Amino acid sequence: MQTYQGIIVDAIYRRKFKGEIAVEHGKIISIEEKEHDIEQYILPGLVDAHVHIESSMTVPSVFARMAVARGTVAVVSDPHEIANVMGEEGIDYMLEDARKAPLKVFFGVPSCVPATPFESAGAVLDAEAVDRLLAREDLHYLSEMMNFPGVVMEFPEVIAKLESAKKYGKNIDGHAPGLNGTDLQKYVGAGISTDHESFAYEEAVEKIKLGMNILIREGSSARNFDTLYKLIDEYPESVMLCTDDSHPDTLIYEGHIDKLLRRGQEKGLDIYNLIRAAVINPVEHYGLNVGLLREGDPADFIIVDDLKAFNVLKTFIDGSCVYNDGKVLFSVEQAPAKNVFNRNKISVDDVKLAMPASGNNGEQMKKIRVIVAQDGELVTGQELALPKVENGNLISDPARDILKMVVLSRYADDPVQIGFIKNIGLKKGAIASSIAHDSHNIIAVGATDEDIVGAVNRLVENRGGIVVGTADNLIDLPLEVSGLMSTLDGKEVAVRYEQLNEEARKLGTSLMSPFMTLSFMSLLVIPELKLGDKGLFDVTKFEFVELFAGE
């Protein structure tokens, strides 16, 4: 038996007291009030209620080392990204690698692979496959149902997946940005219980009043905490905290769920409500085998120096100390590489786009649809603009910050799709990535055609990863596992990734996380205008549109 003394934070009964907990065989066997001089705080370990581990660009066992250092003892994870590339084989890869580390990872079954029928993916998880996966005990819920039009319009394939989850008694996660009114009522009525895509306070309140749980997301790109934080005190039983997509530099230097407890207190939120959102609500909602600092619970807890500073000193999982005083106390063997990548290099001719003959004379020139990126958001706007034309071809216009963007399939040598985007900010060079939600094709944006092609071809040579630079001066981060994750240690990935971000900033971008923002510009389920490997897509209309706008 081992004992630990400190100021015990009981979020269930909303009290703090000096005491001692006793741990034996991985369980808390007693919690007693006891006088002592120790000023450190003991509280339940933190839970990320929705995360795609792949977005850390590290495999689960390496992600675990970063997470426990921030007081996280469990995550609810959707292996959606790797499933889009490798299907069930990718899900099994994540499960197997996660078992190498003590972090409690509760994987779900991806519900939308591919996310839409309007893009090329490496796999399809149809209703039959989803039913088979939901029957497994090592997969715990149906992951975010992004196809909200399919739910509302009762597409048979979509409804079959929802019914499978109900049959096995497993929760259904939602994904419904901007959905409201009768459509939202129908979506919730289909059995969907959570949403992490609320961008407005009023939107989140409407969902809560219909019975949904709102997951407040604060990742590397999508950051909704400042908009939604008041919900934690106003609806304490209906809110959880999550990161969704967090890059390694964010995890190591900013923090994980711990940073939201610090920021929440700075905003005047009740500490017990914050702990409820960070631990109790996800454990109870998903039925996780994670301790809540009660007698008989698994001994999953953390020790921090001070509640407001919230510096994690120790992390315990099942009674074992996995992090102590700046050191992670478990190591993992390097994961094997695994990938699907069938693309060959491209040429400058592949990214050329000729101006239609009817639009070559002055004011009669047709305007093009331009994607308008928004820093820190997954949603985009759209606007019409006159293109810059040189030698009869449409080119990037860095002076107006209207840049050419391309998306091309990683699974076959299909034609390159071309669009234009605003607010990336590059004055020269290009950035490219094989992380391109959700099918993870190749996406690139740049100041010249030559720079775009150079970045894409370096990425093809590496069979996935991220690239930045000019055509004759490129730096990269290869991602050997499905073009999404590195097999390196988290710190190594974070350092290299920050080098790439810094290089992108030198080339002109002011985006907080340029690669993360770029990776969502082909996500055809989040409004308003996106570019996929089959063309320009209006998410609001849920249909392809021409680059050149009609009169």
From Swiss-Prot:
Disulfide bonds: none annotated. Its cofactor is Mn(2+). It is an enzyme of class 3 (hydrolase). The keyword Hydrolase applies. GO terms for molecular function: adenine deaminase activity. Keywords: Hydrolase, Manganese. Its EC number is 3.5.4.2. One of its GO terms (biological process) is adenine catabolic process. InterPro entries: Adenine_deam, Adenine_deam_C, Amidohydro-rel, Metal-dep_hydrolase_composite, Metal_Hydrolase. It catalyses: adenine + H2O + H(+) = hypoxanthine + NH4(+). Transmembrane segments: none annotated. The keyword Acetylation does not apply. Belongs to the metallo-dependent hydrolases superfamily. Adenine deaminase family. This is Adenine deaminase. It comes from Methanosarcina barkeri (strain Fusaro / DSM 804). The gene is ade.
